[in-house]
C-alpha cells in the first residue's frame, strides 16, 4: 500500500556524482581504543612474521593489513572501476516504511544493492584483484557463503584479467543455484564446499556426506588450493582489516549524503565477518573516537550463529581446518557446526578483529534474531520500499523496524541510518520457504568452544 505524503517528501534520496567517489580508504587501526592483538603463527603460537603470509595473500594487501596510516590512497584505476560498477551508491529515505510503522523515527539507508553485482562485496573485490594483477598473480581462489562475495570476485577477475575459483558453502550452493550461474557467466569455476577437490573437503565429507558446509570450511579449502599453486593467491571477503578498510567507501560516501538530510542517531548493519557493517560505520566511529560526535552502533547477527551475543573473545583460527593464523576475535570456535540458515553470508564462526575490539569496549552493541522474524521484516520492507533485501541485509532491516517501533513507543524522533548491503533477487528460495511456512529457526543449546585455542597471553 502506498502512503502518500507532502511535496516536501519528494526529496527522499541522495545521489553523488562520479567525481565524489572517495579518493582514500579509511583505516581504523590507528584510532582503535587499544592496539590490535597480533595474529599468531599456528605452528609456534608466536606473533606471525608478515613475510609468511605472502604465500597466501598479495603483498600489498599484507602491507595494508598492518598499516598504521589512517588513510590509504585508492588507485585511480580502482576508482574508475568503482564508477563502472555503480559507485557512488544512492542513499534513500524509507518514507513509506516510516508511515506504515506510524513512527516519528526517520529511516535512511545506504543501498549497496545498486552495484552491478547486487551487493557491497565488489568494493574490496576490485581492489584485491587490482593488486593481485599488479604482482603477476594469475589466479585468485576464495570462499563464498550466499554467493555475493564469489560473484563480486568473479566479475573483478573478468574485468581485470584473472582466473577465479570459488568454494561455495554447500547449503547455499543448492539453495541459491542462480548465484553459481552468475559466477560462471563471469568466468569463474565454482565448487560446493566441502568438495572432493581438497583433503580438507574430503575429510568433512567422510564425516558427513550431506555436510551443509560453512564459511570456515570453504576458507580452508581455498587456502589448501592456493598452497598447491605458486601462481595463485587467496582473496578474503570479510574479517581482515584490509577488507573492511576497502569497504569504508560506503561510510565515506554516506557522511557526505547525510548532510543533505540530517545526522543519524543510530547506525545499523548486519554482521557475519563484519565488512558491510564496518564499511558504513567506521567513518562515523572515527568521529566518536575523536570525541566529535555521539552515535549508537548496532550490529545484527543470526541467533543460529551468535558470535557476538554468545561467543568468547579469544584467539582462534579463521578457518575450520586450522590452516590460517590465529586471530583474536569473538568466536564460537572454529569447529562450530553452523546451521544451514538462508543468510549464507552470516554463517561464520568468528568476527573481524577490529570490530571485536570495538565491541569489547562497548562502542558497538550486538543484537540477534531468528530467520523467521528477519524474513517477516524483509517482506514488510519490500512491500513498503519496493526493494527485496538479501537475507543477510534483512537482519539489519529487522533491527531498524524494532528501533523505529521503540521510537514510536517513546515518542522520540530517532534518526536511523542502516546499510542495505545487497538485494535478494537471487535469494528467493528463502522467501518462498518463509511465505509457505517452511522456515526453521535454529538456536544452539550448546556452543562448541572446545577447539577455540587460548594462548597463555590471551585475555
From Swiss-Prot:
GO terms for molecular function: L-serine hydro-lyase (adding indole, L-tryptophan-forming) activity; pyridoxal phosphate binding; tryptophan synthase activity. It catalyses: (1S,2R)-1-C-(indol-3-yl)glycerol 3-phosphate + L-serine = D-glyceraldehyde 3-phosphate + L-tryptophan + H2O. Pfam families: PALP (PF00291). Keywords: Amino-acid biosynthesis, Aromatic amino acid biosynthesis, Lyase, Pyridoxal phosphate, Tryptophan biosynthesis. It is an enzyme of class 4 (lyase). Its EC number is 4.2.1.20. It comes from the Archaea. Tetramer of two alpha and two beta chains. GO terms for cellular component: cytoplasm. The lineage of its organism: Archaea, Methanobacteriati, Methanobacteriota, Thermococci, Thermococcales. The keyword Amino-acid biosynthesis applies. InterPro entries: Trp_synth_b-like, Trp_synth_b_CS, Trp_synth_beta, Trp_synth_beta/beta-like, TrpB-like_PALP, TrpB-like_PALP_sf. PANTHER family: TRYPTOPHAN SYNTHASE, TRYPTOPHAN SYNTHASE-RELATED. Its cofactor is pyridoxal 5'-phosphate. The keyword Electron transport does not apply. Pathway: Amino-acid biosynthesis; L-tryptophan biosynthesis; L-tryptophan from chorismate: step 5/5. The beta subunit is responsible for the synthesis of L-tryptophan from indole and L-serine. Signal peptide: none annotated. This is Tryptophan synthase beta chain. The modification N6-(pyridoxal phosphate)lysine is found at residue 121. Belongs to the TrpB family.
Amino acid at each position: 500500500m502506498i502512503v502518500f505524503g507532502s511535496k516536501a517528501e519528494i526529496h527522499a534520496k541522495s545521489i553523488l556524482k562520479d567525481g565524489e567517489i572517495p579518493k582514500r580508504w579509511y583505516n581504523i587501526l590507528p584510532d582503535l581504543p587499544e592496539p590490535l592483538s597480533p595474529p599468531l603463527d599456528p605452528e609456534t603460537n608466536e606473533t606471525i612474521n608478515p613475510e609468511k603470509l605472502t604465500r597466501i595473500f598479495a603483498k600489498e594487501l599484507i602491507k595494508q593489513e598492518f598499516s598504521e596510516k589512517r588513510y590509504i590512497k585508492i588507485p585511480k584505476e580502482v576508482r574508475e572501476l568503482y564508477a563502472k560498477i555503480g559507485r557512488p551508491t544512492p542513499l534513500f529515505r524509507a518514507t513509506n516504511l516510516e508511515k506504515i510503522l506510524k513512527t516519528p523515527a526517520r529511516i535512511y539507508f545506504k543501498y549497496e544493492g545498486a552495484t552491478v553485482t547486487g551487493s557491497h562485496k565488489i568494493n574490496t573485490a576490485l581492489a584485491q584483484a587490482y593488486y593481485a594483477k599488479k604482482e603477476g598473480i594469475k589466479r585468485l581462489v576464495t570462499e563464498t557463503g550466499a554467493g555475493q562475495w564469489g560473484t563480486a570476485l568473479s566479475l573483478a577477475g573478468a574485468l581485470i584479467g584473472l582466473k577465479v575459483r570459488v568454494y561455495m558453502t554447500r547449503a547455499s550452493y543448492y539453495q541459491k543455484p542462480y548465484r553459481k550461474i552468475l559466477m560462471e557467466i563471469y568466468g569463474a569455476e565454482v565448487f560446493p564446499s566441502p568438495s572432493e577437490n581438497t583433503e580438507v573437503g574430503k575429510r568433512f565429507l567422510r564425516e558427513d556426506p550431506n555436510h551443509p558446509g560453512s564459511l570456515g570450511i570453504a576458507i580452508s579449502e581455498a587456502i589448501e588450493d592456493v598452497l598447491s599453486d605458486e601462481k595463485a593467491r587467496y582473496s578474503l571477503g570479510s574479517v581482515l582489516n584490509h577488507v573492511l578498510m576497502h569497504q569504508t567507501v560506503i561510510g565515506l560516501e554516506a557522511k557526505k549524503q547525510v548532510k543533505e538530510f540530517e545526522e543519524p542517531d543510530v547506525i545499523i548493519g548486519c554482521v557475519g565477518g563484519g565488512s558491510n557493517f564496518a564499511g558504513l560505520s567506521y567513518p562515523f566511529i572515527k568521529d566518536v573516537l575523536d570525541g566529535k560526535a555521539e552515535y549508537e552502533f548496532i550490529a545484527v547477527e543470526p541467533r543460529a550463529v551468535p558470535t557476538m551475543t554468545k561467543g568468547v573473545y579469544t584467539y582462534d583460527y579463521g578457518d575450520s581446518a586450522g590452516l590460517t593464523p590465529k586471530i583474536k576475535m569473538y568466536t564460537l570456535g572454529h569447529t562450530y557446526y553452523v546451521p544451514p540458515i538462508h543468510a549464507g553470508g552470516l554463517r561464520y564462526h568468528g568476527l573481524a578483529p577490529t570490530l571485536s575490539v570495538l565491541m569489547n569496549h562497548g562502542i558497538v552493541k550486538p543484537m540477534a534474531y531468528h530467520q523467521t522474524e528477519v524474513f517477516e521484516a524483509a517482506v514488510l520492507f519490500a512491500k513498503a520500499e519496493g526493494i527485496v533485501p538479501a537475507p543477510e541485509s534483512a537482519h539489519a532491516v529487522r533491527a531498524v523496524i524494532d528501533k523505529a517501533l521503540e521510537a514510536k513507543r517513546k515518542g522520540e524522533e530517532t534518526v536511523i541510518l542502516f546499510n542495505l548491503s545487497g538485494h535478494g533477487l537471487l535469494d528467493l528460495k528463502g522467501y518462498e520457504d518463509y511465505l509457505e511456512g517452511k522456515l526453521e529457526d535454529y538456536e544452539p543449546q550448546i556452543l562448541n568452544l572446545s577447539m577455540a585455542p587460548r594462548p597463555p597471553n590471551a585475555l
